[in-house]
Amino acid sequence: MYFVRLLRVANMTCIINKNKFDESSYNKFFSYLLEGNRRQCISFINDCIESGLGLKEIYILLLQRALHDIGDLWQKNVVSVAQEHLATAIIQRLMMFIYQKQALPSPNGFKVLIACPGNELHEIGARMVADFFEIHGFDVKFVGSNIPVRDVVGQIKAFSPDLIGVSCTMAFNLHEIKNVIDAVRETNANVKVFVGGYAFNKNPGLYKIAGADFYAADAEDALAKAKSFLLERGAANELSC
């Protein structure tokens, strides 16, 4: 069922339905982002929050789309590396701002480790996934980008996660993903591993070659599929939606 909200965002009426921001509102935000205007971006996000939007909606409907769009513009040489990096830094700041305003639920008893493998410097998508799991009651360890295999193994031994998520943006790092997953299997054959990121979005079937249990298109998809795997273990009464 589709829902519609009339919001006052950045001094204009913004219509939010299940799938997207009103184009004029999105374009306004995206122009602030391209300009590197962090103050206006924060003001826009604050208005969204005050109007009733939560982390899930803002991450998926606004920030995720903006990241994809800025990446496309960079690939087409429309924006510079500096502009792309500035936009990414602003979005990371916005994510911190949004996260701090969320009320965390009671723990559901499950642990998730999220990492980006060696040579993978793009971590913002993985951070979104980590935040999604945390606001749904998971105990999350997000260890960031460029993590050596030995350190992933060390975290598995110390943390004993039920799930491990590994992100890969650049296709040339896929072998690093496989190295991580091979090490995970040797360390704990029972833990479930999922993968995501731009490299897998372009070719979802690669998750099988990498040895993962499933591929997730985004944070929302990762959460839904993770719950499905855990439900198979008889955890229905422990997971909250």
Model-assigned labels for residue ranges:
Residues 132-134, 142, 147-205:
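Cofactor-cradling patches in redox/metallo enzymes
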Residues 54, 139, 190, 213:
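Residue-level detector of anion-binding/catalytic polar loops
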Residues 107-143:
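Glycine-rich active-site/cofactor-binding loop and its immediate structural neighborhood
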Residues 3-106:
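Long amphipathic alpha-helical segments
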Residues 199-241:
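Peripheral docking tails and interdomain loops at the edges
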Residues 101-116, 182-188, 193, 226-227, ...:
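Long, low-complexity, intrinsically disordered polar/charged segments
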